[in-house]
Amino acid sequence: MRASTVSLKQTKLIRPPRDTVPGQDRPPNIHYVYTLTSFVCLGSFLFGWNQGVMSMIIADKRWLDLMKPANDWAVGFVVSIYNIGCAAGAMTIGFFADSLGRERTLSLASIIFIAGALLQAASYTITQMTVGRLVLGVGVGAYSAAVPLYITEIAPAAIRGRIGAINLMILCFAEMVVFFFVYGFFFMNSNDWWRLPIAIQIVPALILAVGCWTWVPPSPRWLVAQERYDCAHEVLCRLHGSDVAELEIKEIRESLVVEDVSAQSTWADMFKGPVLWVTFLGTTIQFLQQITGTNAIFYYAPTLFMKGGLTAEAANLATAGVGVVLFLAAWIPVMYFDRLGRKTWLQIGTVGMFFALIGIAMLLRHAERHPGDAANNAIVLFPYLFYTFFNMSWSSGSWTYAAEIFPISLRAKGNALCTASLWVSNFIVAQTTPPIASAIGWGLYILLAMFCVIAFFFVRYALIETRGRTLEEMSQIFGLEDIGGKQADGNSERNELLRSSIDSARDEDNE
C-alpha cells in the first residue's frame, strides 16, 4: 500500500452531530453540504473583494497623488503583480492540499492573506503597495484553487454544478458589496480613505482561518488518500448519507489503485500520455476565461466609463452597478447550471459576451468622434450585458470544469495548474490593458471579441460534457482508466445506486 502522507489531524473518528448515533443510518444531508460550502466560500468572498477594491482606488486622484506612479505601465503593474502572487499561491496547492488537507491549506492561505492586507493598508509608497499586493495575491491564489477543489470533493455529482455556482455567487456578492463600500468612502474628506476597504478584509480572513482549522471536516477523498477510511466513511455519511457512503469509498479507493502500487504522482505526470490532453483542456478553459475580457473591463471600469463621457462620480456609481449585475446574474447558474450542462452554458455565454464587446467598441468609437453626445452614456449598458452572460456561463463554468476533470491522484496538482493558468492570463490582461487601450482605443474590445470567437469553437469542438458524472467516472470519460483507477469499470449496479441516491437528494433539495 502507498505510504500515507503525514497528517496534522488526529486519526480518531470525527465526532458526529449531536442528533446522530455512530452506525445509525443517515439520509443525505444536502443542507450540511451547503453550510460547509458557504463557509469555505469566505475565501471566494475575499477573492471577489480584491477583484473590486482596487478598480476605484487606482482611478482616484488622491491615491495617485500619494503613490505617484510614473506612468500607465506602473499603474498596471500594481494591479497585475497581484495576479503573479495569485499564480504562485495557486501552484502551492498541489503540495499543501495533498499534505495538509484542503481545509487546512485554506487556513494557511488566510494567514498569508492577512499579512498582505496589513502591508497594503499601511503603505505610503508605490513600492510598499506593490509588495503588499504580491503577498496578498499569494493568499487569494491559494483560495481560488483550494475552495473549488474542496467543494467539488464534498458535493454529490447531481448538484456539483450548483455548488460551483454558489461559489461564484458569493464571489459576486463580495464584488457588489465592495463597490458600494468603496463608493461610500470615496466621499470622505481624507487622502487615506482607501485604507479601510483594504484593512477590513482581515476580519473574514481570520474567521476563515480559525474555522477551517477547528470545524470544517477534511475532504473525504483526501481522507481516503491518507488511508483514513473510518474518518472518510463518517464524513461521507454526514454529507451524502449512509446508503452510498461505503460505495463511494470503494470508488475512491479503486481510483487510487494504480497510485498505491506505483510511486506518488509528480508534476511531470501532468504532461504525459492522455493526461496531457486533460491538462490542455483545463488550463486552456481557465486561460480563455480571462483573455476574453472580463477583467479588462472589470479592473478599469471607472476609466472605461469616463472615456464614454461620464463624470468621475457617475463612473464610480456605474461601476458599483457592475457589482449588482454580477450578483444578480450569478443566481442563474445556481438554479439552472446542472440542467443544461457545461458546454451549452459556455457557448451561450460566449455569444453574448462577443456582442457586448462589439457594443463597447462601437460606443467608444462614437465617443471619440462625438464627445459630449448624450448617446455616449449608453456605454454603461454593454458592460452590464457582458457580465450577465459571463456570470451565467464562464465565471462558474470554467472553475467547475477544471476542478472536476482530473483523476483523483492528479486532481490537486491539476487544479493548481489550471488556476495558475487563469492568473497568468489575468496578469497579461491587467498589465497590457492600459497601454493597449491608450494605443488603439476602442480596438482593444474588438481584439477581445476575437478571443470570444476562439473560445466558442474551443468549447464546441474540444470540451467533453461532464454534467451528472461522479468524479470517479471522469477517468473513463477522458480515457484515463489506467491512471485514475478502475472506478468506472462497468459496475453498473454501484453507479446506478450512487446516481439514485444523489438524484433523490437533489429532489429533496428542490422541494
Where are the regions a protein language model picked out?
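Short intracellular "coupling" helices and adjacent cytoplasmic loop segments at the cytosolic face
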Residues: 238-248
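Alpha-helical transmembrane bundle of multi-pass membrane proteins
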Residues: 1-240, 257-511
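TPR/TPR-like alpha-solenoid helical repeat scaffolds
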Residues: 247-259
